[in-house]
Design a protein with these regions (language model features):
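Short loop/edge segments at beta-strand edges and connector loops
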Residues: 5, 99-101, 176, 200
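Mobile active-site "lid"/loop adjacent to the S-adenosyl-L-methionine
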Residues: 123-153
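Class I S-adenosylmethionine-dependent transferase superfamily signal
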Residues: 35, 61, 136, 158-162
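Conserved Class I SAM-dependent methyltransferase catalytic core
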Residues: 149-213
């Protein structure tokens, strides 16, 4: 239905949607709430929404944490167009920008530093995609679904490469798939994140893993 009407609501924001992006899920509001609660306590935080898709997560953060400045990072040309449309639609052009970024590669030096990275990356194991419900498998972009053989490719890459744009005390917040929370927590711990938490979605499924960068490696 979202693709037919070309829009969807997320965290109270009406957003443009196309077949270049995933339809925003209520599960992702768990990640938005966790990030917003922390960011409201920071002074003028700089936030990166990596694998931004429609931009729903970063735009929700910008709308609810008025001091935040947000970069929407997305590789897909089609998704990047939707991000830019939604920045304008939400009236957030002063504090939100969109950039073409590849989460699987090290960040560009010109990006600068961030106080928080939020990411809802592709996390479906490649072999599970043929078995997805047809409404997802046949219409939503596989680029936004496929997380590699075990679904963890993007978590590994972000933990390995993107911690370099954070400083001690910065926060990393992930949405994760069913059964992935413990593995992602271990990945984060292995690269210097502490105060790690796993948060459930409204159905009680472990859905968010977050932590603060403690040390340089």
């Amino acid at each position: 239905m979202a693709y037919l009407i070309g829009e969807w609501e997320f965290y109270g924001l009406p957003l443009d949607i196309s077949e270049s992006v995933l339809i925003p899920r209520p599960d992702t509001e768990t990640l938005a709430e966790a990030a917003i609660g922390w960011l409201r306590q920071q002074e003028a935080p700089r936030v990166l929404d990596l694998c931004a898709g429609s931009g729903c997560l970063g735009l929700a953060i910008a709308s609810q944490a008025p001091g935040a400045r947000v970069v929407l990072g997305e590789l897909s040309d089609g998704a990047l167009r939707i991000c830019r449309q939604n920045i304008r639609r939400c009236g957030l052009t002063g504090r939100v920008t969109a950039m073409q970024l590849d989460a699987l590669r090290p960040p560009l030096q010109r990006l600068g530093g961030f106080d928080c990275i939020v990411s809802n990356p592709p996390y479906i194991p490649s072999g599970d995609i043929p078995g997805l419900d047809a409404s997802v498998r046949d219409y939503e972009p596989h680029m936004a679904l496929d997380g590699g053989a075990d679904g963890l490719d993007f978590y590994r890459a972000i933990c390995a490469h993107w911690r370099s744009v954070l400083h001690p005390g910065s926060r990393l917040c992930f949405e994760v798939g069913i059964g992935q929370a413990d593995d992602v927590l271990r990945l984060m711990r292995s690269v210097g994140f502490g105060d790690l938490e796993i948060l459930p979605d409204p159905a009680g499924i472990p859905r968010v893993v977050l932590g603060d960068l403690y040390q340089e490696i």
